[in-house]
Structures are given as C-alpha cells and as structure tokens.
C-alpha cells in the first residue's frame, strides 16, 4: 500500500524560498565586486557558526508575543523588555559577537529572507518595515528567524562546517 504525499502551497513556497536562498549566494558572489562596501544593503558577508548562534539567540529573545515590539524605530535600548526583529538580532549579535554589526551576516541573511517572502513590498529598511507592517504577525517574525536559521545551517553544511 503506498501513501500519497501532498504538497500544499505553503510547503511549495517554503521549498522555493529555501532553494532560492541556498543558491542565491553562489550567483551573487559571482557578480559582486571587491569594492562592495559594508554600507551596501545587499552585501553578503561570509557565514560562520557564530551567525547560526546569533539567529538561535534572537529566537530565544523573541520567544513569545509578549516580548515582541511591533513598533520598531531601530533604536535598541539595553534595558528594553520588548524587542523588534532588528533589535533581537542586534542584541544577539552584541551578546555573542561582542559588538553590534548592522551589516553582519546574520542580519543580512534575515534581510534576504524578507526579500523573498515580502519582495513585492519594497521596504526601505527591510527588518524594521517588515516588523512594523500591519500584516506581519508574531508567527511571521518567528518564521523569518526559523528560515534564516535553516539557511545558515544548510550553507554551513555546504562549506563542511557543522
């Protein structure tokens, strides 16, 4: 007796996003120039195990809807009790890496995930604007972090770094 596996639209979309984001670095790296600056919103820094730890920590920081600040202004006070997507990633970056990195790999990968799932919205500040978008839910924020974590894990495996 064989079982039929059905693929829902959501599953198909998730597979497409992961596939695109795993292959995208190879095409982007072939097209980037050595003069790309750290201020470039599409810069793609190399991924390390630290980036995976940063995204996992950001998920811990934002582990409940009560901790989510959906009114981000990209100012992240140390004493904050609620956190936007951007501030959770920045706080995790500072805790784990020792300093904030606005264009660090973990934040950049999260930006690229937002590009894929909300590319038609053309956000000026992807992390802030996606966080503040009235159609964005806490589950959506968690999904961005989950996909980002999965992509970084896949890319590390591809580099032979587990």
Each language-model region and where it sits:
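N-terminal low-complexity, Pro/Thr/Ser-rich intrinsically disordered segments
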Residues: 34-58
């Amino acid at each position: 007796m064989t079982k039929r596996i059905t693929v829902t639209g959501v599953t198909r979309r998730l597979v497409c996003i992961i596939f695109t984001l795993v292959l995208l670095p190879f095409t982007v790296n072939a097209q980037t120039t050595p003069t790309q600056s750290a201020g470039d919103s599409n810069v793609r820094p190399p991924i390390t195990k630290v980036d995976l730890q940063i995204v996992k920590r950001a998920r811990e920081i934002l582990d409940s809807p009560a901790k989510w600040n959906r009114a981000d202004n990209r100012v992240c006070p140390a004493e904050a009790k609620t956190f936007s997507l951007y501030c959770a990633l920045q706080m995790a970056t500072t805790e784990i890496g020792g300093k904030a990195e606005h264009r660090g790999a973990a934040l950049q990968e999260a930006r690229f995930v937002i590009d894929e799932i909300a590319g038609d919205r053309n956000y000026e500040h992807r992390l802030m604007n996606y966080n503040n978008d009235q159609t964005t839910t806490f589950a959506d924020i968690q999904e961005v972090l989950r996909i980002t974590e999965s992509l970084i894990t896949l890319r590390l495996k591809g580099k032979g770094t587990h």
